[in-house]
């Protein structure tokens, strides 16, 4: 029997939990910015697996690293050393300009690790009374799906019927420095922010906001945690989005593109004063820092650096965003962009537009009902962007 997209979608819906609402498309092959379905139809990927595929699908260098390491050793656990963890931690420390790195697997694991580090630091270094440490988070955030992460959230879709939530969290309006100042208490350990909010619809904070957050954290002896899981590794036209304001957080949270689109790799990076709160047995991960992850991750960073994807994202993002802004359609409210991290907000829900774009060969996804996120692999060419713009115009103007 020939397996069709319809068969696969029906089987997935029957046997799988319905915690996602994907477009009716099945991806069976991928290369660069393009994917194919089982019927052989080609589509341009404008989502990049939520920015996990910045280097393009199946980049040859990353796949080669994966295969070579898979032929040697894939997993040792942290009960033993492996020969790539040392070089990988050094590489990551140099990249982030931090003393130490702690490897995990998924983005939300890195978020959890950062918050645990901040709480321990508050008790052991700052002197907060035990079990009283507080974390400040911003409305509209997305830090993941664990109970701790959704405790930071104010999104009803993410939080409904999952309580009780983790205590010690104060929420403030994103972009409002005065709100942060009012939320700070003697027990505040850290503030966690996305430098640009992704799931909220590519929300860019007011100019100077991150710099003021950095200054306030330094003044009040609070840690600044930057969740760069989605914005990191060249997505916004900088290696890390904090660089748009020349800001250095106390803790970097990294993931997604760190794994080159082929393996889950995440990490936090911080200086010794923070990292030294961890002692054997206080935190861990069986798969974190495994040799396969290290090999893939170093190749993923090589690709970003060797192919100059930071500048490519910056230049391509400006070109693509300008083209989107020039589209003549009165339903468009605003186009927000940093590099190839682009949100096109409409005055109405956009699910139907995404489905029509799929029919034209473009895969993108709505976020928060009224916004389409355009975040193609950073290897996209000018000709490919022009191809996409033509079809976006056709859908919107017809």
Swiss-Prot record:
<dbReference type="GO" id="GO:0042802">
    <property type="term" value="F:identical protein binding"/>
</dbReference>
<dbReference type="InterPro" id="IPR034757">
    <property type="entry name" value="Ornith_aminotrans_bact"/>
</dbReference>
<comment type="similarity">
    <text>Belongs to the class-III pyridoxal-phosphate-dependent aminotransferase family. OAT subfamily.</text>
</comment>
<comment type="pathway">
    <text>Amino-acid biosynthesis; L-proline biosynthesis; L-glutamate 5-semialdehyde from L-ornithine: step 1/1.</text>
</comment>
<keyword id="KW-0641">Proline biosynthesis</keyword>
<dbReference type="InterPro" id="IPR015422">
    <property type="entry name" value="PyrdxlP-dep_Trfase_small"/>
</dbReference>
<feature type="modified residue" description="N6-(pyridoxal phosphate)lysine">
    <location>
        <position position="256"/>
    </location>
</feature>
<dbReference type="GO" id="GO:0005737">
    <property type="term" value="C:cytoplasm"/>
</dbReference>
<dbReference type="InterPro" id="IPR015424">
    <property type="entry name" value="PyrdxlP-dep_Trfase"/>
</dbReference>
<dbReference type="Pfam" id="PF00202">
    <property type="entry name" value="Aminotran_3"/>
</dbReference>
<keyword id="KW-0032">Aminotransferase</keyword>
<keyword id="KW-0663">Pyridoxal phosphate</keyword>
<dbReference type="GO" id="GO:0055129">
    <property type="term" value="P:L-proline biosynthetic process"/>
</dbReference>
<dbReference type="InterPro" id="IPR010164">
    <property type="entry name" value="Orn_aminotrans"/>
</dbReference>
<protein>
    <recommendedName>
        <fullName>Ornithine aminotransferase</fullName>
        <ecNumber>2.6.1.13</ecNumber>
    </recommendedName>
</protein>
<keyword id="KW-0028">Amino-acid biosynthesis</keyword>
<dbReference type="GO" id="GO:0004587">
    <property type="term" value="F:ornithine aminotransferase activity"/>
</dbReference>
<dbReference type="InterPro" id="IPR005814">
    <property type="entry name" value="Aminotrans_3"/>
</dbReference>
<keyword id="KW-0963">Cytoplasm</keyword>
<comment type="function">
    <text>Catalyzes the interconversion of ornithine to glutamate semialdehyde.</text>
</comment>
<dbReference type="InterPro" id="IPR050103">
    <property type="entry name" value="Class-III_PLP-dep_AT"/>
</dbReference>
<dbReference type="InterPro" id="IPR015421">
    <property type="entry name" value="PyrdxlP-dep_Trfase_major"/>
</dbReference>
<keyword id="KW-0808">Transferase</keyword>
<dbReference type="InterPro" id="IPR049704">
    <property type="entry name" value="Aminotrans_3_PPA_site"/>
</dbReference>
<dbReference type="GO" id="GO:0030170">
    <property type="term" value="F:pyridoxal phosphate binding"/>
</dbReference>
């Amino acid at each position: 029997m020939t397996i069709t997209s319809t068969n696969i979608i029906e089987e997935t819906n029957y046997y799988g939990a319905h915690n996602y609402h994907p477009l009716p498309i099945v991806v069976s092959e991928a290369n660069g910015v393009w994917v194919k379905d089982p019927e052989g139809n080609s589509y341009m990927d404008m989502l990049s697996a939520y920015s996990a595929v910045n280097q393009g699908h199946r980049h040859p260098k990353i796949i080669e690293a994966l295969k070579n390491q898979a032929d040697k050793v894939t997993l040792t656990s942290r009960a033993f050393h492996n020969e790539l963890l040392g070089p990988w931690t050094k590489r990551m420390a140099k990249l982030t300009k931090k003393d130490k790195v702690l490897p995990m697997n998924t983005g939300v694991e890195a978020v959890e690790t950062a918050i645990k580090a901040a709480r321990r630091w508050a008790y052991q270094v700052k002197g907060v009374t035990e079990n009283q440490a507080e974390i400040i988070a911003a409305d509209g955030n997305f830090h993941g799906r664990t109970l701790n992460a959704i405790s930071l959230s104010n999104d009803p879709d993410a939080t409904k019927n999952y309580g009780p939530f983790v205590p010690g969290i104060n929420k403030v309006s994103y972009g409002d420095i005065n709100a942060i100042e009012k939320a700070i208490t003697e027990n505040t350990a850290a503030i966690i922010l996305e430098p640009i909010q992704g799931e909220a619809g590519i929300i860019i904070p007011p100019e100077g906001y991150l710099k003021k957050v950095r200054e306030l954290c330094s003044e009040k002896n609070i840690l600044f945690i930057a969740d760069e899981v989605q914005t990191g590794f060249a997505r916004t036209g900088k290696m890390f989005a904090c660089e748009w304001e020349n800001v250095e957080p106390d803790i970097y949270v990294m993931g997604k593109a760190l794994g080159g689109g082929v393996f889950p790799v995440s990490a936090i990076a911080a200086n010794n004063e923070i990292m030294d709160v961890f002692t054997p047995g206080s935190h861990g991960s069986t798969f974190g820092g495994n040799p396969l992850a290290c090999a893939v991750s170093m190749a993923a960073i090589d690709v970003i650096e060797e192919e100059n994807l930071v500048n490519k994202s910056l230049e391509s993002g400006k070109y693509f965003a300008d083209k989107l802004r020039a589209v003549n359609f009165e339903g468009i409210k605003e186009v927000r962009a940093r590099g190839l991290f682009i949100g096109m907000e409409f005055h109405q829900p956009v699910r139907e537009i995404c489905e029509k774009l799929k029919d034209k060969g473009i895969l993108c996804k709505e976020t928060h009902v009224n916004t389409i996120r355009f975040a193609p692999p950073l290897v996209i060419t000018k000709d490919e962007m022009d191809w996409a713009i033509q079809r976006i115009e056709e859908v919107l103007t017809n």
